[in-house]
Amino acid sequence: MAFSSCFLLVLLQIFSALLLCLAQDQSGFISLDCGSPRETSFREKTTNITYISDANFINTGVGGSIKQGYRTQFQQQTWNLRSFPQGIRNCYTLNLTIGDEYLIRANFLHGGYDDKPSTQFELYLGPNLWSTVTTTNETEASIFEMIHILTTDRLQICLVKTGNATPFISALELRKLMNTTYLTRQGSLQTFIRADVGATVNQGYRYGIDVFDRVWTPYNFGNWSQISTNQSVNINNDYQPPEIAMVTASVPTDPDAAMNISLVGVERTVQFYVFMHFAEIQELKSNDTREFNIMYNNKHIYGPFRPLNFTTSSVFTPTEVVADANGQYIFSLQRTGNSTLPPLLNAMEIYSVNLLPQQETDRKEVDAMMNIKSAYGVNKIDWEGDPCVPLDYKWSGVNCTYVDNETPKIISLDLSTSGLTGEILEFISDLTSLEVLDLSNNSLTGSVPEFLANMETLKLINLSGNELNGSIPATLLDKERRGSITLSIEGNTGLCSSTSCATTKKKKKNTVIAPVAASLVSVFLIGAGIVTFLILKRKKRTKLGLNPNSGTGTTPLHSRSHHGFEPPVIAKNRKLTYIDVVKITNNFERVLGRGGFGVVYYGVLNNEPVAVKMLTESTALGYKQFKAEVELLLRVHHKDLTCLVGYCEEGDKMSLIYEFMANGDLKEHLSGKRGPSILTWEGRLRIAAESAQGLEYLHNGCKPQIVHRDIKTTNILLNEKFQAKLADFGLSRSFPLGTETHVSTIVAGTPGYLDPEYYRTNWLTEKSDVFSFGVVLLELVTNQPVIDMKREKSHIAEWVGLMLSRGDINSIVDPKLQGDFDPNTIWKVVETAMTCLNPSSSRRPTMTQVVMDLKECLNMEMARNMGSRMTDSTNDSSIELSMNFTTELNPGAR
């Protein structure tokens, strides 16, 4: 189509006005010219973007420049580059604001800076692979974009060497977006295409025309025709596509044909989000209508839709789209029977999903390690990026925990023979899961700090071969004497215990013979102490030891785990006396609840609230359950299981001391006993997912496998943050190691939650827990009693099944939710629950499958809630593509 002079004039006026506005707002822009000298900056002449040196954001790499002859072909931010000949992983670190959404762009141009233009290396966003960067010649430029919502206040972008080629980078650009745009259920978005559809100029553009500095490329197709207008188009919605893109569009050349957009050359596992921008840019006659449906892989997903006159409407998918059975991704705009005009499309953005599955190391621990690195001047070539992940690139001398769906934490730090000077840094105390600390063979000075004694997880401290002085904290020496910690201090001639330091001070004015003699005696005593400690420790490995806290000489209930070693939390989960329990509960002053086991009291231990469960009678069954729970909780640790703080066993006085769960149990909240506040559907899904994770850990994360046997809403407790944790393990059973798929037991559990197959056969499997959890899920959806003799069907599962058979899901949903939920997630949870309740255990899902289903539902509900909070300055101009989402609770819509 010819480009009219009038339209060209409008286009040039818009373009010139934007470029001449040198003071145009660049707040939220971070533009790094990689490899340029520190403190240098410039304004790029075609975009007027100000770039600064990257030197303040990275400590490694060397600067370089492209060949002089290439500079006229490329923008100035690519004239320099930073290469990384040393190390495997090198990272940029930017301090930003958690929750902000950024467009992140990495630019690569070899430009002949060395004689090896053929390269391949990897680009990482934090601990997750972003993309593989490949160059084959000097003038091949590559750009990688990611739209990412920050989950921490530190962003790291890393280049990783994967072969012999040297990684490099030319420019790094971050553009802050509005937090209401480009929302996903999970993961981040990598740019697949950003197209100015129907563009009449074959040239891309970015900032100065696009307020967010998105890079747009022209896109036309042989069977499409371009249309344009010289009128202005309102672009003021959240996405703000550039007006230059919106004053042009494409329509099918054949007015009866559909507009098909096919994504080719894509692996069928890739998921996409699609954003389409529409505006009617033709003056329609009174009898003209432009109306069309949006199809995906021959399925109707939105419409009929009519673009607004000279006003931008943005249509997007709130959930990812996937390939069909043939691996195809085909979007189609098809005119309706009421339409006199063909469909049109002005602009389009398509992004692939990068799930970024690897969680970053705990934020506080990363800060601690960065501070330790800086303060000690640690110069280890691999101390770049995240200390723990990915595992292949973790820091030397650092070991971490790696548990699915949990943030990695540092459990071991070895800085021996690292040339450290100064005092022992208090930053170490921020490593709250640290078990082993080795600072040996350095030049550390000062005293042994008290905070080391207060780190509850520490089991081994090696301070030998330093220049430490003063007294060792008495609490640390006491922990060593009790065997809860191993302390090595050899070679620190100025160190002494508190007692020996006092003696030395008192006799300071004596003759030289006295201190020499005292030193010899001290050496002898220390040596004797070490020998004694080693002997006792050796005996401890071969014989059950006495509990130092009991004072009664009784043997602990659980002194060895099933793997043949003492559980690491024995020292923390200590045995208490009955007198201790009386003090903790202030003579059993406040009752929290009562159950079949006994009474639960409120208590305070070490200034922290606890719950104390007392066994009322020393029955054989009660003692057996008590012993089972202590033994289980001393070896099982998970964030979604209640934590045992201590226990007491003195004759018939038996108690369990737990962390205090401030918000009681799930049943109380569903029943309204906790007040008028209502658990939202998102809150219920979160509780379901967390308790499912705890149960899944018992089934699959414990060796031998553990079956809870009493899953119910009263055994799901909620802490002050409403995090759910499974409780009450008195009926739990461990499976013997081996190939057994079930054990034969006397039936135990709670009526209504009890697996009928287990009740009938006495055969217990993990699928018995799955049945009980299915009942819990139905309670979360319906808020109905498990057994109600007044109902047409007394058991909740039978009643829900009856309602579903009548196509009446509306009547089963808790009316307290007031319709504030995504009906698809209701359906999904009910379907999952009914599968869990299958009479045949072999046809029930595993808890792993249940966790996956619930997380999917939670993500969908979170995305819906984020979407409902979005504002749009053009009212109804921003429309979601509803991918099989229903608007009413109607089973027919599914």
UniProtKB/Swiss-Prot annotation:
Residues of the signal peptide: 1-23
Q: Give residue ranges of the LRR repeats.
A: 431-457, 459-479
Q: Which residues form a coiled coil?
A: none
Which Gene3D superfamilies does this entry report, sorted A to Z?
Answer: Phosphorylase Kinase, domain 1, Ribonuclease Inhibitor, Transferase(Phosphotransferase) domain 1
May I have one GO cellular component term? pollen tube
Name positions with the PTM Phosphotyrosine.
Answer: 658, 758
Glycan attachment positions: 48, 95, 137, 179, 223, 230, 260, 287, 309, 338, 399, 441, 462, 469
The entry's note on the tissues where this protein occurs is: Expressed in roots, cotyledons, leaves, flowers and siliques.
- The first-level EC class reads transferase
Indicate where this protein resides in the cell: Cell membrane
Q: What induces it?
A: Accumulates during infection by filamentous (hemi)biotrophic oomycetes (e.g. H.arabidopsidis and P.parasitica) and fungal (e.g. E.cruciferarum) pathogens, being locally expressed in cells surrounding the pathogens both at early and late stages of infection. Induced by microbe-associated molecular patterns (MAMPs) flg22 or elf18.
Domain of life, per UniProt, equals Eukaryota
Q: Which residues are the active-site ones?
A: 710
Q: Which UniProt keywords apply?
A: Abscisic acid signaling pathway, ATP-binding, Cell membrane, Glycoprotein, Kinase, Leucine-rich repeat, Membrane, Nucleotide-binding, Phosphoprotein, Plant defense, Receptor, Repeat, Serine/threonine-protein kinase, Signal, Transferase, Transmembrane, Transmembrane helix
Pfam family membership, one: Malectin_like
Q: What happens when the gene is disrupted?
A: Reduced infection by filamentous (hemi)biotrophic oomycetes (e.g. H.arabidopsidis and P.parasitica) and fungal (e.g. E.cruciferarum) pathogens, independently of plant defense mechanism. Hypersensitivity to abscisic acid (ABA), displaying enhanced ABA-mediated inhibition of seed germination, root elongation, and stomatal opening. Impaired repression of ABA-sensitive COLD REGULATED and RESISTANCE TO DESICCATION genes upon oomycete infection. No obvious modification of defense-related gene induction during pathogen attack. Hypersusceptibility to the necrotrophic bacteria P.syringae.
Q: Which residues lie on this side of the membrane: Cytoplasmic?
A: 537-894
Please state the Enzyme Commission number of this protein: 2.7.11.-
Keyword Transmembrane helix among UniProt keywords:
yes
Write out the topological domains of type Extracellular. 24-515
Q: Report the residue ranges that make up the Protein kinase domain in this protein.
A: 586-858
How does the annotation summarize its subunit structure?
Homodimerization. Interacts with BAK1 and FLS2; triggers FLS2-BAK1 complex formation upon microbe-associated molecular patterns (MAMPs) treatment. Also binds to CERK1 and EFR.
Q: Which family does it belong to?
A: Belongs to the protein kinase superfamily. Ser/Thr protein kinase family.
Q: What is this protein called?
A: LRR receptor-like serine/threonine-protein kinase IOS1
Q: Which organism is it from?
A: Arabidopsis thaliana (Mouse-ear cress)
Give the classification, highest ranks. Eukaryota, Viridiplantae, Streptophyta, Embryophyta, Tracheophyta
